[in-house]
């Protein structure tokens, strides 16, 4: 989230799209209801299903799954054509006025630079025009034909209300009603907040879904505002912490990047990741990348990391390609993986194409499962009839189960969707032989290091040089790790005037103190300030709220630097006056920035040319994304890989995303509409949490049996009655479930045909105390978003018949 949960109450309009907050985030959803009940906010829901969220909405608009970009691009066009934008915000705080290269183009579904053989773009034309000083050219009158504003207007001109209705199946009147309410928040004293979740991310165009929404927020002037922003509702407790700490194959903690095999030395790596400002007088905060990286290496390797050895740069692995789950299981399926350590995951139930996952795991020599519960992954080799029809005697994979603790059995911090790090304390000891994950990993690490020390072997140095200075080396305490994340001064730190800022050995209170000379250590720079010499800031429990905005700065700690709303400089105009006095976050008092949040902008007074989006090279919000996304610098509608239309109404020659990575063996397992004519989409229920809570008796009583939802029209055409058992199949497999016939799903008229949706809750499997069921991801395709490789769980093709 750019904002936070409590801030939702400040919105005038709450849009839930790409999620079902009332069902999947019932506690957090109270703040949407607070906005509705106490701030007279309008609640809008755009969803393929009439959900529990929709049941309390003021406006509900149905949409075909996988067409969000068309809907949102239609909103962009409406705002532009009706001049419903915050013009001053757009002019001064976005890149609307910057000029784009003359060779950038878009035609028939493709941007300039496309290589059909490689299925990727040469993105060199997706850039600004630059002057002799290396700065982007600008036309503040917004009249130049190559300025971002005019290129955007041209690009979205196709997304008329009629086109939205034709592609999305959303009735034109419903769409225009949504546009009209959103447009009302172009006024400086009104804001919209967008709440989204996996309903946007789990598509082959997931990142572009989110980006299109962010562009709407920029046009409306809602970024940086209380009651505004881009707000992801994270799907797991502490999944925010997972991404913060870089648990992805090409990431390092704090959103740093793991070096690639093309970055053979430290200088080439730092040059590639340290941007230069593209407009004068910009903060360009990523210019501090070397400080963050060197401090990370000092935390990793301690005294072994020195300037003479490039701070241990050679000890980091260098990636040749992203090893996401789709890639990794494809390698596994092809016999290229020997072992798999599975920590806190249930791939058999959670990853796409369950039958391929089981087949892949069957080709391993060994697998280690670290989990508090018995998962389908840990017992994938057992036969459970139709739902997991395997031959155990043919599977030679040796499975090691290491029982771990759950959150209630350990101390530590949890990072929520709003970037708040909240410390929690152990409620009880773990049962049996269960150990926390840190203790388990420490045990593996020490045994590996001892083997390398005594026997040698390839890649020994990174393990042998690693710093491991915990009081109990076999059991690092959460407090020690948290302080390590925060960071220490390794020498006395002085400012340029000779003033002492921190003594050697002290915990740091700001990442502004991090250095690239080896005098500081921090294993996650964005967490610096979370545990200072004043104590554990994450344990703060003062919920005083003098502003009434919900920015309880004394409750827990938010990264960065306890700031609750990112880019809050944009909440004030260029003169430092808040756009809306009653929603004031920061303002200029004549000498400095002050207010109801931690200012993210301490460097320049009003009247300077310094933009509010301090992490960007140009200091501006990007309506034109440059080369940052795989599909293009503007969002474009591409059909899901399995489309019920068989074409793309906008450009039939380019139906789906042209840059999707698709393995041959997965391509042949994609279905066509002649055999699988209905759209399948997966989702969650309030009564369960993924595949965990089928181990809990109360949850299993509340929702005991697997079911799917279909419309009354589809039920009638297939002869299915409410309560009948049905078989739902895709090109990859089938499941059996009870049919729930409901008006919550509509038959949509799309491009001259009727489109039906089959709703598939995902919680069942063959483990736990709940009634045994089929794994929903038996049906889903093994293809993902081209940027994140998040699988396309939300739009695929199925058939349904009475069982």
Residue spans of the language-model regions?
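Glycine/threonine-rich phosphate-binding loop and adjacent beta-strand/alpha-helix elements that clamp
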Residues: 5, 397-429, 741, 762
């Amino acid at each position: 989230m750019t904002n936070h949960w409590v801030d939702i109450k400040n919105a005038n309009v709450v849009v839930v799209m790409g999620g079902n907050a009332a069902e999947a985030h019932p506690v957090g959803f109270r703040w949407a209801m607070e906005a509705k009940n106490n701030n007279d906010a309008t609640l809008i829901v755009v969803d393929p299903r009439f959900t529990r969220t929709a049941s309390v909405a003021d406006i509900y608009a149905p949409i075909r799954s996988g067409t969000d970009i068309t809907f949102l691009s239609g909103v962009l066009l409406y705002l532009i054509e009706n001049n419903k934008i915050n013009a001053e915000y757009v002019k001064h705080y976005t890149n609307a006025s910057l000029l784009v290269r003359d060779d950038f183009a878009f035609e028939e579904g493709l941007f300039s630079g496309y290589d059909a053989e490689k299925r990727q773009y040469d993105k060199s034309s997706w850039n600004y025009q630059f002057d002799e000083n290396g700065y982007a050219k600008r036309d503040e009158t917004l009249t130049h034909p190559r300025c971002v504003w005019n290129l955007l207007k041209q690009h979205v001109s196709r997304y008329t209300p009629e086109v939205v209705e034709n592609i999305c199946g959303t009735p034109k009147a419903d769409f225009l009603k949504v546009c009209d309410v959103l447009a009302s928040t172009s006024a400086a004293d009104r804001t919209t907040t967008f709440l989204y979740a996996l309903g946007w991310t789990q598509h082959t165009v997931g990142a572009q879904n989110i980006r299109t929404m962010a562009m709407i927020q920029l046009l409306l002037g809602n970024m940086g505002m209380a009651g505004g922003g881009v707000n992801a509702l994270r799907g797991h407790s502490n999944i925010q912490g997972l991404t913060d700490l870089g648990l992805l194959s090409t990431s390092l903690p704090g959103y740093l990047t793991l070096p690639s095999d093309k970055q053979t030395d430290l200088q080439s790596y730092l040059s590639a990741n340290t941007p230069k400002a593209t407009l004068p007088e910009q903060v360009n905060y990523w210019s501090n990348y070397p400080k963050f990286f060197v401090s990370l290496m000092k935390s990793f390797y301690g005294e072994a990391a020195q300037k003479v050895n490039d701070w241990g740069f050679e000890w980091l692995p260098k990636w040749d390609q992203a090893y996401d789950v789709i890639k990794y299981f494809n390698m596994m399926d092809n016999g290229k993986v020997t072992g798999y350590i599975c920590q806190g995951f249930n791939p058999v139930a959670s990853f796409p194409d369950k039958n391929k996952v089981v087949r892949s795991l069957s080709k391993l020599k060994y697998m280690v499962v670290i989990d508090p519960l018995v998962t389908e992954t840990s017992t994938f080799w057992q036969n459970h009839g139709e739902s997991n029809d395997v031959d155990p005697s043919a599977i030679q994979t040796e499975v090691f189960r290491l029982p771990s603790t759950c959150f209630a059995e350990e101390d530590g911090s949890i990072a929520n969707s709003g970037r708040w790090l909240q410390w929690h304390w152990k409620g009880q000891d773990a049962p049996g032989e269960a150990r926390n994950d840190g203790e388990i990993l420490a045990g593996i690490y020490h045994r590996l290091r001892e083997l390398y020390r005594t026997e040698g072997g390839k890649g020994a140095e990174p393990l042998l040089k690693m710093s491991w200075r915990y009081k109990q080396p076999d059991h690092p305490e959460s407090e020690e790790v948290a302080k390590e994340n925060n960071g220490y001064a390794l020498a006395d730190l002085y400012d340029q005037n000779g003033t002492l800022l921190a003594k050697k050995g002290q915990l740091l209170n700001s990442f502004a103190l991090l250095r690239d000379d080896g005098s500081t250590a921090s294993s996650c720079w964005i967490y610096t300030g979370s545990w200072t010499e004043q104590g554990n800031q994450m344990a703060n429990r003062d919920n005083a709220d003098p502003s009434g905005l919900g920015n309880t700065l004394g409750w827990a700690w938010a990264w960065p630097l306890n700031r609750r709303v990112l880019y809050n400089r944009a909440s004030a105009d260029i003169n430092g006056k808040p756009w809306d006095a009653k929603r004031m976050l920061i303002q200029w008092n004549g000498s400095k920035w002050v207010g109801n949040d931690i200012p993210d902008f301490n460097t320049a007074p009003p009247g300077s040319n310094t933009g509010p989006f301090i992490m960007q090279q140009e200091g501006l919000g990007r309506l034109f994304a440059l080369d940052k996304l795989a599909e293009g610098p503007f969002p474009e509608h591409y059909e899901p890989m399995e489309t019920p239309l068989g074409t793309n109404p906008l450009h039939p020659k380019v139906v789906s995303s042209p840059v999707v990575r698709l393995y041959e063996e997965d391509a042949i397992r994609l279905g066509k509409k002649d055999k699988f004519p209905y759209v399948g989409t997966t989702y969650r229920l309030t009564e369960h949490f993924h595949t965990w809570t089928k181990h809990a008796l109360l949850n299993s009583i509340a929702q005991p049996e697997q079911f799917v939802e279909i419309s009354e029209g589809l039920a009638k055409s297939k002869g299915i009655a409410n309560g009948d058992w049905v078989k739902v199949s895709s090109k990859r497999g089938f499941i059996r479930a009870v049919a729930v016939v409901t008006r919550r799903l509509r038959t949509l008229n799309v491009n001259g045909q009727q489109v039906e949706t089959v709703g598939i809750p995902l919680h069942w499997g063959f483990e736990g105390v709940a009634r045994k069921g089929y794994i929903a991801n038996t049906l889903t395709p093994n293809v993902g978003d081209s940027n994140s490789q998040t699988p396309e769980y939300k739009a695929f093709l199925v058939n349904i018949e009475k069982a």
